[in-house]
A protein has these predicted regions:
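Short capping loops/turns at secondary-structure boundaries
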Residues: 33, 37, 53-56, 71-75, ...
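Active-site ligand-binding patch in enzyme domains
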Residues: 69, 79-86, 90-218
Length: 219
């Protein structure tokens, strides 16, 4: 990634490169951050440092795709995970089947949970499976659990609510549900359990576009 040239959470990379008198710099991909966006390369060249850009650019763009997505959209990079049979089913009609995937795929899912900042499901999954949505890989970090629950149907006795003080948990609902008088007692109990509530505007459940923007603001 192009060396940064602004003061953020860390000092400018360009300053230390100049200070250490590094003669040549090879850049894979340019920084899409408007605070950098080519300025880092120009500063180095202005100080007589040889800079070559575009080294393995496609590979670098892929490597940094999460960063590029966030820095240009200010919304989370989302990966969809789903499992289904060859005929397009995810479970038996009776609900008897527990696993569609095998052990290898399930292990990969938990590795993904350890790598990604959050995991999102709908209220239907919570009601049907009462999941923990934690990371079960040794040394892994539990992701932030995000539940899309338009009308706040999440049971207070669910695993999600009972463990919200241990694992960061967000419940996204409609703004209407968040402001409804009849929901205030439940909202109080959810907050006491350690759950953060996010309301979104919209006539058809949780507004995912608005939710992504609000989640991005929490980074």
């Amino acid at each position: 990634l192009e060396p940064c040239c602004h003061q953020g959470k860390t000092p400018p990379c360009t300053d230390i490169i100049i200070e250490k008198k590094i003669a040549r710099v090879f850049v894979g991909s340019m920084d899409s951050n408007p605070l950098v966006a080519g300025k880092g390369v120009q500063i180095l060249r202005d100080h007589g440092i040889y800079v070559e850009t575009g080294i393995l650019e496609e590979e670098c763009l892929k490597l940094n795709e999460v960063f590029y997505h966030y820095i240009t959209t200010k919304t989370p990079f989302v990966v969809m995970k789903y499992a289904m049979t060859l005929d397009g089913k995810i479970a038996c009609a009776t609900g008897d089947s527990r696993w569609v995937t095998g052990e290898t795929a399930r292990a990969q899912v938990h590795r993904m949970r350890g790598r990604y900042r959050g995991i999102m499901v709908g209220i239907g999954t919570v009601l049907a499976d009462d999941p923990m949505l934690n990371c079960r890989v040794e040394g892994g970090v539990d992701p932030v659990r995000i539940i899309c629950d338009s009308n706040l149907h999440i049971p207070l006795a669910s695993q999600i609510v009972k463990t919200a003080s241990e694992i960061e948990t967000i419940v996204a609902c409609s703004q209407e549900a968040l402001e409804a008088e009849r929901k205030q007692e439940k909202i109080r109990k959810l907050k006491e359990a350690g759950i953060q509530l996010i309301g979104t505007e919209g006539a058809h459940g949780v507004n995912l576009v608005e939710l992504m923007k609000k989640l991005g603001e929490q980074n």
